Amino acid sequence: MAIKYFKPTTNGRRNMSSLDYSKNLTGHEPTKSLMTILKKKAGRNNSGQITTRHKGSGEKRKYRLVDFKRQKDNIEAIVKTIEYDPNRSANISLIVYKDGFKSYILYPKGLKVNDVIVSGEDVDIKIGNTLPLKNIPEGTFIHNIEMQPKGGAIIARSAGSSAQILGKDDNGKYVVLRLKSGETRRILAECRATIGVVGNEEHSLVNVGKAGRNRHKGIRPTVRGSAMNPNDHPHGGGEGKQPIGRKSPMTPWGRKALGPKTRKTNKSSTKLIIRGRKKRINN
């Protein structure tokens, strides 16, 4: 999908870019039976307190019901459309099974309209097909990966993401994957995945350009703690541009930041990680 750049007619448009959806999408209206109402919570809980900062309502939109399980085995499906989904960075495709059942799936790179895809235990290694990890050869790039059998995919679902199969363990119970983050981990061999890489990989190259586009997405501004009052943040207060007045940076709730690990120590999946993700190096 090509990137469209704008002329610098205003300050907000000077560095703005967007994806040219006319190059790849089929332009069909979304299927009403596969949409549902999406309620906006704007980061609040049932009592109205902010539980997640920097979240707003954004544009009104409906949620597309995407099939992350792909459990209709050995029934061929035809790809009918390639559509935009406002709720995720990846595009989606409408597929129609031979028995007439319709569903949305994540659009993998290289899939075309009228292509035939299928799910099952021993289906072909072809873009868009879904099968257990134990039946996928080494070196294959996959996406839409489950962590528990029949639990639905939760890994490699965003635009341009994928994982690569490195091998299988000695007893065949686990398959070793290398994720996009650089993390190497084991996944149960019975879990399913889809062949290919998630499409719309140019999504990360888009320059938002102005704050208003983020507000449409439901992203509110991020304010520095040192610009707040002392009753709002541990870094707040002081006359003019003062230091934070602490030995180390603090979170808004008074805990130390930039140091302590934030991952839960009692997660059962931690023991399946062979090598952690690559650390970012700030230049």
Swiss-Prot record:
Q: Which domain of life is it from?
A: Bacteria
Q: Which SMART domains match?
A: Ribosomal_L2, Ribosomal_L2_C
Q: What SUPFAM superfamilies would the database entry show?
A: Nucleic acid-binding proteins (SSF50249), Translation proteins SH3-like domain (SSF50104)
Task: Enumerate composition-biased segments (Basic residues).
Answer: 274-283
Instruction: Please give the GO cellular component terms listed in this UniProt entry.
Output: large ribosomal subunit
Name a biological process GO annotation: cytoplasmic translation
Keyword list, A-Z:
Ribonucleoprotein, Ribosomal protein, RNA-binding, rRNA-binding
Family the UniProt entry places it in: Belongs to the universal ribosomal protein uL2 family.
How is the subunit organization of this protein annotated in UniProt? Answer: Part of the 50S ribosomal subunit. Forms a bridge to the 30S subunit in the 70S ribosome.
**What protein name does the entry list?**
Large ribosomal subunit protein uL2
Q: Which gene encodes it?
A: rplB
